[in-house]
Amino acid sequence: MADLDQQFLLSQIARRGPWNDCANLPTVVQAASEQTRIGLVLADAAFDSERNHTYIRRELGAQSVIPAKRGKKTWRIHGVRAQMRREFSRRVHRRRARIESLFSSVKRKLSARAPGRSLRAQKRQALLLGLSFNLYRLRHRCLFSRMSTGPDGF
């Protein structure tokens, strides 16, 4: 989970992939909501489930913008998912592309792999990558805020 405006990671889970992360969305969102108020959750179609929409909207009081999965024609979409399909905002969901930019930045600046031998070490290294990226962003944000373009900034 990330703050797209500040480009910070708010919460993360590390596990061996490939894995279906749909069931983990409430856990990750809950961990992030303990750090800051969550007003909007953007996710891709892999996270589309009635359970996820209901959790985000009822438990957190946030808006969820998750495109509906394309399934069999016999699937009946009802409840919050049906409402999401009717009222889906492509303009708002376009902001989700920023998370891909953030992931790319983590991989470029730090690393794309956790080379530990054991699964436990790999998980720990993956979580430390997220922490390191946040520290990197804090440092560079402070440097940019101290820079001045005015003539008296020297």
Name the predicted role of every residue range:
Residues A45-P115:
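Helix-centered, glycine/charged polyanion-binding patches within enzymatic domains
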Residues A31-A32, W75, Q125-A126:
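Juxtamembrane/interface motifs at transmembrane-helix termini
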Residues R85-F154:
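Basic, amphipathic alpha-helical segments enriched in Lys/Arg and hydrophobic/aromatic residues
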Residues M1-L60, P67-K69, G130, S148:
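Polybasic low-complexity intrinsically disordered regions
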